[in-house]
Amino acid sequence: AAGYLSDDFIDASFDFYGRAMSGKQEQKPRWKRAMSVPNSTLGEAVGEMYVAKYFPEKDKARMLEMVRNLQTALSQHIAGLDWMSDATKAKAQEKLAAFTVKIGYPDKWKDYSTLTIDPSESYWQNIKAASLWGTLDNLRKFGKPVDKDEWLMSPQTVNAYYNPTTNEICFPAAILQ
């Protein structure tokens, strides 16, 4: 919470976490820190706007086709390996068939309709509201099956990942620009 409070708290927090723990020489200007908040608290909402402007559906379709072609080529390569036993090939093909591909942006956007950001409230009150909403959103998932379609990155993130525990790749729209 220190990052959202007065300069005294922000500076003390940076002195410890930024300088002492991370070796940073200076913190980002306040305006840059403030501009990063919507991205971190409303990632998919910002991502939806980003995608509408910069990543048309045809680009997603083209990337999905390219990945499917790579999967087909890899499947053929596995089938032709002479050093791999038939049982191991079958397991490799099974894993390849179960591979999850996330390209560009989610097929279903996160619903933020229960989150209220009130311009008449203080910045801190709105940060608390967003934090509470995020916590409740996570608690709603408790005891339910894992949503394998949920993204761990927003579309405007310039990064990509392979998650071996879920056997998925994710290439957000921004990394594909």
Question: What role is predicted for each listed range?
Answer:
Residues 1-41:
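Structured mid-domain segments that build the active-site/substrate or prosthetic-cofactor binding neighborhood
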Residues 28, 39-177:
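Intrinsically disordered, low-complexity linker/terminal regions across diverse proteins
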